[in-house]
């Protein structure tokens, strides 16, 4: 085991504070509409330019082990906030720095660190309750656009795209962000249920120009197993032919003889038919087939349910207004499933999302939910250079998370004002002793930090701005850093999601409180490099 170096009390806190400051100073330069960019060197490819706090924090690694510990703890604040709320990472870092600084001063002057932490926790709980009480539910699409615009660093185009995407696919819909091949940013919305399986044979194509199968008002046969011959399917095929409607077969696979027979019948013109593989694998495949069945009011033909292919009737087949099948994907539009059944299935999937502990499972469940509930929107981010596209994509990701958070828990005035106004809740906080009261006052001062930093990044004097804001008591009265004007921030469209503000404060206080109570730090001693071997002297060669 390598030898360790230990630092105690003031010396430990000073080292830690230096690390916190180095990381926070790099991150906080990005805060607000007039925040600057940070350039990050990459070991391969062009440097990355970003204004995303967590991306900056993740790149910082300090040489001094003790300073690095402080920096890594604050990096954890940014990562945690990013994971939960998706935005607000810079605000969380600024708050953590302010609480650690004030807390370290109080500990050095002889306060009890544990009581300080209890005071900090009491204050945070009171402010969070005040924020929740003042949060406004999102009432229209323009507010979603405003949240997106603020989060994307004042880029109104991104805000507009996000609002449009959420309007089209609903709050449960999936919105994905990709890099475009062109200089333009564009939005593509896929309505209905789409899954990533295409036609099994190009001979099924009905629209040769676009190389796709297009069916109006088809029947849909949903089969869990492979189809290797059509003998057992003949009764249902004959019934479909008599109805003169197209038929889509979704099965684990359609092989050899069965596929050849379907293709021959299609080419001879007697049968409008297409076959695709079922989406997903294993248990997820079963669940997705059930989803398709509920969406189209069909039945999954499964031997587990005791249904044999020979006994299938037309009323067991699903129906949809339109089906479009391309080489790589299939889209079912306007399935004829009952609204109550679909809502029941959506509620069931939401419950599974709440219960699951796996991020991968949660992502897959969210996708299934979106396909049932609304659709999928893809925002393709364009730019003149790869560096620009990556920087813009970071901002779109932030804005997307912020708009989702806003829909979830409502909105608050932006610009750091919500935290400033929520301070009035601290007057009613009861503490057990003077040291806890100092802990409460640490938070009272620390929550000014985001508003000060936004002002300073915009070239104004933070203390003057905060002083002017304190003169007024209206909750939404603040300073717009973009225009330099005072007024109602709701009316000016300067708004933050309540979830982002709340999470930033809770995560910052959680880690900062632990840093304040640190009394000793332990790190491995740096290894001394062994001296190089002596060169052979004259007359010593063998």
UniProtKB/Swiss-Prot annotation:
A Pfam entry, by short name: Cpn60_TCP1
EC number(s) per entry: 5.6.1.7
Alphabetical keyword list: ATP-binding, Chaperone, Cytoplasm, Isomerase, Nucleotide-binding
Chain residues that bind ATP: 30-33, 51, 87-91, 415, 496
Reactions that this protein is recorded to catalyse: ATP + H2O + a folded polypeptide = ADP + phosphate + an unfolded polypeptide
One BP annotation, GO: protein refolding
GO molecular function, one term: unfolded protein binding
Compartments it resides in: Cytoplasm
Top enzyme category: isomerase
Gene Ontology cellular component list: cytoplasm
Family recorded in the similarity comment: Belongs to the chaperonin (HSP60) family.
Function: Together with its co-chaperonin GroES, plays an essential role in assisting protein folding. The GroEL-GroES system forms a nano-cage that allows encapsulation of the non-native substrate proteins and provides a physical environment optimized to promote and accelerate protein folding.
UniProt subunit comment: Forms a cylinder of 14 subunits composed of two heptameric rings stacked back-to-back. Interacts with the co-chaperonin GroES.
Name recorded for this polypeptide: Chaperonin GroEL 2
Gene: groEL2
């Amino acid at each position: 085991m390598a030898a360790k170096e230990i630092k105690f009390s003031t010396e430990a806190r000073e080292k830690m504070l230096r690390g916190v400051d180095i990381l926070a100073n790099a991150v906080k330069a990005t805060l607000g509409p007039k925040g600057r960019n940070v350039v990050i060197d990459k070991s391969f490819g062009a440097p990355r330019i970003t204004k995303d706090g967590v991306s900056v924090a993740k790149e910082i690694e300090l040489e001094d082990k003790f300073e690095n510990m402080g920096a890594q703890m604050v990096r954890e604040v940014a990562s945690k906030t990013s994971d939960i709320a998706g935005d607000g990472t810079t605000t969380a870092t600024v708050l953590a720095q302010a609480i650690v600084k004030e807390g370290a001063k109080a500990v050095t002057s002889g306060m009890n660190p544990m009581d300080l932490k209890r005071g900090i926790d009491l204050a945070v709980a009171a402010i969070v309750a005040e924020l929740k009480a003042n949060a406004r539910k999102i009432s229209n699409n323009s507010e979603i656009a405003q949240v997106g615009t603020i989060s994307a660093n004042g880029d109104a185009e991104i805000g507009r795209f996000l609002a449009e995407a959420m309007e089209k696919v609903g709050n449960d819909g999936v919105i994905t962000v990709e890099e475009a091949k062109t200089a333009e940013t564009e939005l593509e919305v896929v309505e209905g249920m789409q899954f990533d399986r295409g036609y099994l044979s190009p001979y099924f194509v009905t629209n040769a120009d676009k190389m796709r199968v297009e069916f109006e008002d088809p029947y849909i046969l949903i089969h869990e197993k492979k189809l290797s011959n059509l003998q057992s399917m003949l009764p249902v095929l004959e019934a479909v032919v008599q109805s003169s409607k197209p038929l889509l077969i979704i099965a684990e696979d359609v092989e050899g003889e069965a596929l050849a027979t379907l293709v021959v019948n299609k080419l001879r013109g007697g049968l409008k038919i297409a076959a695709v593989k079922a989406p997903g694998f294993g248990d997820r495949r079963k669940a997705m087939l059930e989803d398709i069945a509920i969406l189209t009011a069909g039945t999954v033909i499964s031997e587990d349910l005791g249904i044999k292919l020979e006994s299938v009737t037309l009323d067991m087949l699903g129906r949809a207004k339109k089906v479009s099948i391309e080489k790589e994907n299939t889209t079912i539009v306007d399935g004829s499933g009952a609204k109550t059944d679909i809502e029941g299935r959506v509620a069931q999937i939401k419950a599974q999302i709440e219960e699951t502990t796996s991020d991968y499972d949660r992502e897959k469940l969210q996708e299934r939910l979106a396909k049932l509930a609304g659709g999928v929107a893809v925002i393709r981010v364009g730019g003149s250079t790869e560096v620009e596209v990556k920087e813009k994509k970071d901002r779109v990701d932030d804005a997307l998370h912020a708009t989702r958070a806003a829909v979830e828990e409502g909105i608050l005035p932006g610009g750091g004002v919500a935290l400033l106004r929520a301070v009035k809740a601290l007057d009613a906080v009861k503490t057990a002793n003077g040291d806890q009261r100092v802990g409460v006052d640490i938070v009272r001062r620390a929550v000014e930090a985001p508003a000060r930093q936004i002002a300073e990044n915009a070239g104004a004097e933070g203390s003057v701005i905060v002083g002017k804001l304190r003169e007024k008591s209206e909750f939404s009265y603040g300073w717009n850093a973009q225009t330099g004007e005072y007024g109602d921030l709701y009316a000016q469209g300067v708004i933050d999601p309540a979830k982002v503000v709340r999470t930033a404060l809770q995560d910052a206080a959680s880690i900062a409180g632990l840093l304040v109570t640190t009394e000793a730090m332990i790190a491995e001693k740096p290894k001394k490099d062994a001296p190089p071997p002596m060169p052979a002297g004259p007359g010593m060669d063998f």
